[in-house]
Amino acid sequence: MRTAVLLVATLAACSTTVKHRDVDDAEARKLLLDRNWIEHMPQTERDHFHVYRFVPSMGGGVFQDRTIFKGTFELFQFETAADEIRFNLLETHDKVVSKFRIEEVDGPEPFDLKLTIAADPRGPQVYYGMRAETDRDGTKLEARLRK
């Protein structure tokens, strides 16, 4: 009986439901741009994390390997087509094509978007972002804060 109770408790702890919805390719290509995609929210100023930012108006993107106050960066060029990112890594001259997917998620807080880069040329493959980051008039952020 004790084993059965422990098993049920363990299964309950492991089966948290995470709400998510895959975003179609066209919307994903728009959501990819002009926002920070962060591996995880740092808990201390010395936590190590990775960040992508895809900024076509500046001619490419940046990958950061950092803490809050210190880090390194790498500039790259990119194109998107369907569900792919085509990276042109300027330092190494490597060209990498990777499938990507964006999902709407409910956390981890404060995130509501999840980016997965299948063959990530630099980082951990999974990053989180916020729709409100590019919310020009603040309505999405306001709605999120009222939850």
What name fits each language-model region?
Residues 1-7:
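Sec-dependent signal peptide recognition
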Residues 5, 31, 55-57:
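A short, polar/charged loop/turn motif at coil->beta-strand junctions and beta-hairpin connectors
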Residues 18-28, 51, 86-147:
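Beta-sheet ligand-binding and adhesion/scaffold domains
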Residues 20-48, 76-80:
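Tryptophan-anchored aromatic micro-motifs
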Residues 37-42, 62-67, 87-91, 115-117:
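Short beta-strand segments that buttress and anchor functional surface loops
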Residues 43-84:
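N-terminal glycine/threonine-rich, aromatic-flanked beta-hairpin/loop signature
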